[in-house]
């Protein structure tokens, strides 16, 4: 069939990039196998291929992911959907999908990884530093140090908006440095300390204190 011919071309390396792949993919989507297991396997293979060819921002990729979820709704497929939504800058929808994925698994490591993905969206994409900071402190396991690095960045990025005086605002960098040290990032800790109050700041602040 034409679908099988397209599949053969793709997996034999005839199709080299996203532009070559998508026209054949439209044929594939319209002629998916009727057998559910084969449908799932073939769709999964094409999702992997589109990732490899950097086609994840195409509407065809979203159609494939939605097709896979329809027939094989698992934690992995929901995460794939969330990653697609991140690419499309639909960040709140992505977080919703990741929370749905959390509800479908009891695997501790997978839960930690999903929590870290949510943290990254909150920090890198939405710039929600308060939310990201709170999430970061709750993350354990293999992602703990990376989460603490993000927590330190949240404190540093929010430093100028937290405190009633310049001295108080600069003091936030002490805490950012502490978090960075806990994360094992001594370089970042040193940079944060360089923004903390210096000897002159401390002297001037003491002079302002009530006698």
What are these regions (language model features)?
Residues 2-10, 18-22, 33-47, 57-61, ...:
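Generic helix N-cap/helix-start motif at coil->alpha-helix transitions
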Residues 65-141:
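Long, well-ordered mid-to-C-terminal structural blocks that present hydrophobic/aromatic surfaces
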């Amino acid at each position: 069939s034409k679908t099988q011919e397209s599949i053969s071309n793709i997996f034999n390396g005839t199709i080299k990039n996203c532009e070559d792949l998508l026209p054949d993919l439209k044929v594939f989507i319209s002629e998916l196998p009727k057998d559910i297991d084969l449908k799932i396997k073939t769709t999964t293979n094409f999702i992997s291929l589109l990732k490899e060819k950097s086609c994840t921002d195409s509407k065809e990729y979203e159609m494939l992911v939605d097709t896979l979820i329809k027939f094989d709704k698992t934690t992995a497929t929901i995460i794939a959907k969330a990653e697609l939504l991140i690419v499309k800058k639909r960040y709140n929808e992505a977080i919703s999908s990741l929370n749905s994925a959390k509800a479908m698994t009891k695997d501790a490591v997978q839960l930690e990884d999903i929590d870290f993905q949510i943290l990254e969206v909150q920090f890198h994409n939405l710039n929600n530093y308060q939310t990201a900071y709170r999430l970061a402190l709750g993350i354990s396991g293999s992602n703990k140090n990376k989460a603490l690095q993000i927590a330190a960045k949240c404190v540093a990025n929010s430093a100028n908006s937290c405190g009633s005086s310049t001295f108080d605002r600069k003091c936030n960098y002490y805490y950012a440095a502490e978090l960075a040290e806990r994360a094992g990032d001594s370089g970042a800790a040193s940079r944060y300390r360089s923004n903390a109050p210096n000897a002159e700041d401390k002297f001037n602040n003491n002079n302002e204190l009530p006698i």
